[in-house]
Every structure is written in C-alpha cells, then in structure tokens.
Amino acid sequence: MSLSIKNSGDYMSNIAFAFTLSTLAGLSTLLGFLPLLFNLKDESSIILKSLAFASGVMLTVSIIDLIPESYNLLASIFKGFPALLLLLIFLVIGIIFSILIDKFLPNNNNKLFHLGIVSMLAIILHNIPEGIATFLSASTNQKLGLSLALAISFHNIPEGISIAIPIYFSTKNKKKAFLYTFISGFSEPVGSLIAYLFLAKYMNNFLMSILLSFIAGLMIHIALFELLK
C-alpha cells in the first residue's frame, strides 16, 4: 500500500475517521480492566497469553506494514541506499526512545501501586506518538491507519492489564483502577489532537516516513523487550 500526501482532495473527509480510529485504539486500553470483573482461576496465564499475542501483532504490523511503507515513501524521494539508511536511522531512534522511557521510568515490582503508576506514565508516553501516527496515517491512507490502529488496540489491552491489576490489588479500589487505565488510553486521542492542530498542515512524504519508521522502532522494542520480558 502507498500513501499519497499530494492527492489530498478527500483529506478533510478522513479527519473524523482518523479521530475515531485513534480514540477507539486508545480506549481499547480499558479492555484490560475487564479481568477485574470476573473471578479468574488462572489470571497469570491469561495475562501471559495476551502479552504474547500483542507482541506478535506489533511485530507483524511493524515488519509487514510500517517499515515497507516508510521505505516506499523515502524511496520516492531518495533513491537506493540513502532511503534505507534514513529508515534505519529513525527506526533506531524509535528503539532508543522506548529504551529511554524504560530507563527514566524504572519498574519496581515490589510496590504494586508504584508499578501501576509507572506503567501508566510509560504507556502515556508511548500512546501520544502512537496517536499522532494513527491520525496522520488514517487521514492520508485509511487502510494503513486501520492496520496501525488494530495493532495498537491489540497491544493496548495487555497494557491496560498492566495498569489495572497492580492498581486494584494495591488499593482494592476498582474505580481508581478504571480511572488510571482510562487516563492512559485517552492519551491516544490527545496525540491525534496534537497531530491535527500542529502537525497535519506540515506533513509530507518525508515526515510521514520518519514517523512510521520511528513508531516501528518503538513497537519493535515494546514487543521484544517489554511485552515478552
């Protein structure tokens, strides 16, 4: 699939679609709260399986959709090796960004409430650029935007679990667990709003390719070193 930034006659008609996708993708985080509504016999097994599934989805979308799309956009501007080099540079930057989030928001497994808060902050930092990418992708290419939104939705569910469960078991307060999970998910449409207000009018093939490769790096690191650790 290919993006066409220049042929943007129907761009405005895609704005509502893009906002809807990013909002649904973000609020899918709330599905991570659902286990608290049931008496699960093997909760740890469910969490592990959902994390593994989300990791597979994120890797698949990054490798099959985001990276090829980023390269195609770069190849329309730069021929041959420069396009590949730029893709790799911003892919690595995305990975480094995710690593820095882990470094400066350390995970303390001995304190459940702290774990839930740290998870929420880390996920908010992940969700804002994902919201930007979803909005900009969907507003120019609905298929790419839908693919990205689905992948984000799948990995947002176990991320919701990583917030809701520690918060609940540390406070015994389902309302608080729901609220913190909601705040995390709502950061995704906030990212879309940022994209619409400040970034959309400056977007072109080069900037879109940078964003896609950056998000691919971010998602690859999350998939391999956070969801599976």
Annotate each predicted stretch with a short phrase.
Residues 1-229:
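Intrinsically disordered, metal-sensing/regulatory segments
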